[in-house]
Amino acid sequence: VNKCYITGGIGNSSFVMQDWELRNNIFTSNLDMSNTSNSNNLVRNNVFRSSINLYNGYFANNIIQNTTFTVVNVTVKNNLSIGAPAGFTPYVGTFGNLNNQTDAVLFQGLTGNSTDGQWRLKPGTPAVGGGLTVGGITPDCGAFNAQDGYVLSGIPNIPTIYELTVPASIPAGTATMNVTLSTRNNN
């Protein structure tokens, strides 16, 4: 699951989840990957606004604001929390994990931004360059600005065709047809 804005939550403790990757997402609801048979799940560079339950995986470069943080047999590195969520305290001060951050300090906020754009980082916050260095690259924490980061409104940085006008029919024997194509640059 990559570059999604998720409002309905993910997971179920009844199902075994193996080799899942959740990267560069914004979660406004719960993440429940608490089946004890889960294995090798990667949760990296996300923004979480609700509870997290994760068994057997890797959790890094995330920004969390939730009521509970429950992990078992999970490597927890370079995450930031808004306030001090229950269960996150044992990880604070180790492997780059920090707590007691605030939305106002980390994020741009809703004013002048879209629903998903409000979670972009403010310059100079601990989340900027706060991710785990891999292959000589130190990403930001959160969903944006990581390698292959979250894309606002899901629109990639490539030209988009937003209108196409084609005649319903052309006269028999006509060698050409006029078509109108409208594009927009999303860079």
Task: Identify the residue ranges that each predicted region occupies.
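Generic short alpha-helical hydrophobic face used as a protein-protein interaction/packing hotspot
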Residues: 83, 131-132, 185
